[in-house]
Amino acid sequence: MVKGGDYLTRLLCDIETYSAADLPSVGVYRYTDDPSFEIILLSYKIDDADVETVDLTEQSIPEWFLDALTDPEYVKEAWNAQFERVSFTRILRRLKRLGPDEWLDPRQWRDTMVQAMELGLPASLKQAANYLGVDQVKDPRGVRLIRYFSTPTKPTVKQPESKRNMPADAPEDWELYKSYNAQDVRTEAAISDKLAAIKTQAHEWDLWAMDQRINDRGVAVDVPLADGAIHIMEHANAINMAHLKTVTGLDNPNSLMQLKQWLRDQGTPMEKLGKALVQEALDSGKLPPMVADALETRLKLSNSSTKKYLMMEDARCADGKVHGLLQFYGASRTGRWAGRLLQVQNLPRNYLPDLDLARSLVKAQDAEAIDLLYGDVPDVLKQLIRTGLTASPGHRLVVCDFSAIEARVIAWYAGEEWTLDAFRTHGKIYEATASQMFNIPMDRIDKQTRQKGKVATLALGYQGSVGALKAMGALNMGLTEDELPELVDKWRNANKHIVRFWYDCQRAVETVLSGGGVVRLQKGLMFYKRKGFLFIKLPSGRRLAYAKPRLEQQPDGRSHITYDGQGDKVGFMRLDTYGGKIVENIVQATARDLLADAMLRLEAGGYPVIMHIHDEAVADVPDGFGCATLCVRQSRGPRACR
């Protein structure tokens, strides 16, 4: 590995660990922060040498390895490198090789999983190895061995206290575990070598390092608020469960089987009890009073939003913060971030008139006063979740977001000048859209017409039709089903350049897949195929990747664009795409690049970002820092987009 003419040693590594904390539930930062955390096996590979394994239940981590962790001459590489980097950080802190607030520098690390995800490949080591057909596959015995050696046993009647299985308890399995650990390094190395021909941009590694720093900083938790909310929630749940038992006469109303049978007995059978369906049934006003009472109570019990307070407590580290809330390249194809743990990108909004009063009542655990003033205790708790994430002492949170970023980006790509003019001037995109659609002057757009412009703007930009309008809630906005086809036609007639952009992108992909070569479109977009991937190069220089793309003849005689990718459910599968969907990927990926570059500028300017939500950056700054400078820095577009 060479950088700037100097040779850098490549150090591939993989570890097996033990902690009493549950990794999937609390994340790697809290998992490694637990006092019981240990690294029990270490396997590594230097450049092209053989894999070495160190049994850390018998030996210590070699001194040279500890030195290498902070030596920039070694490039550390792992699959999901955040796990190794955070784990080794905890160990180096214990050894006083790092300060209590220091983290291993992510700029010295490379993550093979990120390389795979950038190419639209599986995020699972096993799945990626199988898909790529590398000769070193992941050892399938790992799940059982991890469960045995790396997690505490679950309490049973015979063994009421959990215990830890040690190597001496199963020496043969321990030898298998060491072999499994070593094989993971071989598999990771094989994947890394396979992907080396398609290099990840240096700028993307800068962004990954920034992402790691954001996760390292963490977000402070308002502990009294979380504690108060949990107390109120548990008390309310006990009351609601007792009430539900009284209404239904069931021993266990949580049992779907029992509750469905009870509903059938009441003459109101419901085969599915999802939140949306239950709410729809309640809104219909056709349910018998007792059934409505039972279902309303069940909704209160199933309020998953308030469970986020429990996550704040469970995932909080000793520094009072929750770390690891965002995953880099979590969305394949676009490269957008994905939420983890608290899912900060999906927190309920708040519209309470007096947040400070509501917060003080929750901290005082005064459910009676909350009920008296607001009437709906679970709803108040739900609305206050956002306020449970706070600034550090002596700091405040400052926020800036990109307004209607996708509408701006798609108009910029397509050259839809009237939309761009609206953003350059008054910024009222919904009114401007309605004006274009219905040929009505802006100053005569009423509330109902604006609503049509709004739902059309939000739903139709990516070749959506009537179904997209319905999914966006058009029928709940006062529109009738008969109006929807006309709304689609009017929007497309008003946005001819965007419509043309859909078909230009589709033709570009079809041309590349059928005849090869390179197709260039406006704003520097470039479509080409290389090493079994379709690539779309963005103005930022980043490439969107689609694995094993091809044109497939459908029964209707038309060609469809297909590729291998992650479906909505677990597993890699064959997926279809089309012009509007390709445009959606391009637009969302470009919006991601704009936010990513903005966060680099904010960090460089003394605004350390601690989290970001969709197109909004949140920085934790000392009291006295203003928002104006942050907004100026964030709004300064990259050179490629000027």
Indicate where each model-derived feature is located:
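Conserved RNase H-like, two-metal-ion catalytic cores of nucleic-acid enzymes
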Residues: M1-A123, L352-L355, R359, A411-Y413
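Active-site palm subdomain of RNA-directed nucleic acid polymerases
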Residues: L195-L207, L594-A617
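Generic long, charged, amphipathic alpha-helical segments
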Residues: I429-Q448, Q554-I610
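Conserved catalytic palm subdomain of right-hand nucleotidyl-transferase polymerases, strongest
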Residues: L12-C13, W79, W109-D111, A391-I405
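A short acidic-Thr-Gly-centered motif at the start of a beta-strand
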Residues: M1-T9, L66-T70, V380-R396, L600-A604
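Short, conserved charged micro-motifs
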Residues: G624-V632
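A common structural junction motif
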Residues: M477, Q634-C641
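Conserved "right-hand" nucleotidyltransferase catalytic core of DNA-directed polymerases
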Residues: V2-T17, A21-L23, D34-S36, L41-S43, ...
